[in-house]
Regions:
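Terminal alpha-helical segments
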Residues: 1-143
Length: 143
């Protein structure tokens, strides 16, 4: 298997992780479960999509903030993705941080629910971009 095919497989894996995270967020939301958990899954859905993009970039980071900054600088500010998606990713990160690390911070449905739709659009747009850039169709990959 070539390096390009391995990159495509990893990108597809990251996009699958993104889709699963958003499915989990939807399940938790409709089930009336913890909004902290919903926000966490929304953020990770978007984060995994960004990791799929970074497979094709000369960049690595051990910090989420670095990944987000790179996405905003190289994908949003360059015009490849709309500013609204950059804002949605930043909002998801902020809510996940607050929900996971602040002891007395409570998320509301009004904060979290709209972000679920934005996250779905985010992942769809990343997939479309990668499909156009490298042709991620699974049937084109060889063993």
């Amino acid at each position: 298997m070539s390096i390009d095919e391995k990159k495509k497989l990893l990108a597809l894996h990251r996009l699958q992780q993104a889709a699963e995270s958003l499915e989990e967020a939807q399940y938790l939301m409709t089930g009336g479960k913890s909004l902290r958990s919903v926000a966490n899954r929304i953020y990770y859905g978007m984060f995994y999509a960004v990791l799929a993009l970074l497979i094709y970039e000369p960049y690595t980071s051990s910090k989420h903030s670095g990944v987000l900054a790179y996405f905003n600088k190289h994908f949003v500010k360059s015009g490849l993705f709309p500013e609204s998606l950059g804002r949605a990713l930043s909002k998801a990160f902020e809510l996940r941080q607050r929900g996971d690390y602040r002891e007395y911070f409570e998320l509301t449905k009004d904060q979290v629910e709209p972000l679920l739709d934005e996250a779905g659009q985010f992942v769809a747009d990343v997939r479309k971009y990668l499909d156009e850039k490298v042709g991620l169709q699974e049937d084109h990959l060889k063993d």
